[in-house]
From Swiss-Prot:
Strongly expressed in neurons and glia of the brain, the lamina propria, submucosa and serosa of the small intestine, in oocytes and on the fringes of the pancreas. Not expressed in the retina, eye lens, heart or bulbus arteriosus. Expressed in the yolk syncytial layer in gastrula stage embryos, in the yolk syncytial layer and mature somites in early segmentation embryos and in the yolk syncytial layer and the liver of long-pec stage (48 hours post-fertilization) embryos. The lineage of its organism: Eukaryota, Metazoa, Chordata, Craniata, Vertebrata. It is an enzyme of class 2 (transferase). This is Glycine amidinotransferase, mitochondrial. One of its GO terms (molecular function) is glycine amidinotransferase activity. Keywords: Membrane, Mitochondrion, Mitochondrion inner membrane, Transferase, Transit peptide. It is found in: Mitochondrion inner membrane. Its main location: mitochondrion. Belongs to the amidinotransferase family. InterPro entries: AmidinoTrfase.
């Protein structure tokens, strides 16, 4: 039987905010007392703040950002954009995360836009997805359009950009805090810029905002000799805990983490290293516990098409990539569901992902799920679980590397912080 424990006081952010507010208040009081000795300083201290300068502290009742898990009723969501999407240059970290049959595509088109007609179809699909989300009562927000074809240079590398299609990769909401992830692909170095207007708005309205240490992405972050010619090579290396990213500096994609209240599960992957996981552990403790889990996966990158938590004590577990720690979940009373084989045809291009995007679903609440209209078998699986399916077709959007979970970041879900893993 699944055990659930409610925590008093909401998220850790509220406590921290009040403590910081008190400390800042004392500091300001001392400063103003000293400043009163000077007439000029006193006058300056009495100047009122403009509306734009007044930034409120977050409260659980009013904060526009609040999510504790993957299934509470969804109220607001960021949905990515396919516009201007560019093929990333074929660097070692891209090679390690893509299938060999697509390597000629990257070699030919790296730095250029994805096929125009395909992107146009993806844009139309995501627009329809947004319309359906709004029809289901969810507020939809979008990142800014950006020209990703522009080349940029840092002291360590040069690259063109990629897209702002997958907010799940870069943004993670934990309680009332938005965390910007220090992603590992050089083509995604400036992706955060598309989301900054939204994040600043949420911050001004009371959300907490944290940016993890930005990696330099110097050559030392990548194993330049990483052997990835065959799937067998990848299986052996992953089993040995060896990946294309080194431990030179912290890096992680937010999509390698998945939330279940006070417990957050993460995998070490091609884009998330142990330093990145340790940074998150220290940042979120003691309220949240980070659990590292692993899978029989030759190409680990993003957990949500391998292990997708869809309800309290309910998880989809990919049969092709079994979780090595699955008994831990069963002992905790969780129900482990094996999704059916995806129906996506072999000839459909999936430049950055596998067919298992069929299980990369978005829960609107415990009893509603957004699922691909073409995947009839997984629809039946959800219906057998008593979950209503909201059907949308995003086949062309899938080609850019994500399903419904990838294409979104849930900004606000109505619920409280609880423990589901005791």
């Amino acid at each position: 039987m699944l055990r659930v424990r409610c925590l008093r006081g909401g998220s850790r952010g509220a406590e921290a905010a009040h403590l910081i507010g008190a400390l800042v208040g004392r500091a300001l009081s001392g400063r103003l007392s000293r400043a009163s000795r000077s007439s000029s300083s006193s006058a300056a201290a009495q100047l009122p703040l403009s509306a734009h300068e007044q930034v409120p502290e977050p409260t659980a009742e009013e904060c526009p950002v609040c999510a504790h898990n993957e299934w509470d009723p969804l109220e607001e969501v960021i949905v990515g954009r396919a516009e201007n999407a560019c093929v990333p240059p074929f660097t070692v970290e891209v090679k390690a995360n893509t299938y060999e049959k697509y390597w000629p595509f990257y070699q030919q088109y790296g730095g250029q836009t994805f096929p125009k007609e395909h992107v146009q179809k993806a844009v139309a699909e995501i627009e329809e997805m947004c319309n359906i989300l709004q029809h289901e009562g969810v507020t939809v927000r979008r990142p800014e359009p950006v020209d990703w074809s522009l080349e940029y240079r840092t002291p360590d590398f040069s690259s063109t950009g990629m897209y702002a299609a997958m907010p799940r990769d870069i943004l993670m909401v934990v309680g009332n805090e938005i965390i910007e992830a220090p992603m590992a692909w050089r083509a995604r170095f400036f992706e955060y810029r598309a989301y900054r207007p939204l994040i600043k708005e949420y911050f001004r309205r009371g959300a907490r905002w944290t940016t993890a240490p930005k990696p330099t992405m110097a050559d030392q972050l990548y194993d330049q000799d990483y052997p990835i010619r065959t799937v067998e090579d990848r299986h052996k290396l992953a089993a040995q805990g060896k990946f294309v990213t080194t431990e030179f500096e912290p890096c992680f994609d937010a999509a390698d983490f998945i939330r279940a209240g006070t417990d957050i599960f993460v995998q070490r992957s091609q884009v998330t290293n142990y330093m990145g996981i340790e940074w998150m552990r220290r940042h979120l403790s003691p309220t949240y516990k980070i659990h590292i889990i692993s899978f029989k996966d030759p190409n680990p990158m993003h957990i949500d098409a391998t292990f997708n938590i869809i309800g309290p004590g309910l998880v989809l577990s990919n049969p092709d990539r079994p979780c090595r720690q699955i008994e831990m979940f069963k002992k905790a009373g969780w129900t482990v569901v094996t999704p059916p084989t995806p129906l996506i045809p072999d000839n459909h291009p999936l430049w950055m992902s596998s067919k298992w995007l069929s299980m990369n679903v978005l829960m609107l609440d415990e009893k509603r799920v957004m699922v691909d209209a073409n995947e009839s078998t997984i629809q039946k699986m959800f219906e057998s679980l008593g979950i209503k399916t909201v059907k949308v077709s995003i086949r062309h959007a899938n080609s850019l590397g994500g399903g419904f979970h990838c294409w979104t970041t849930d900004v606000r879900r109505r619920g409280t912080l609880q423990s589901y893993f005791l």
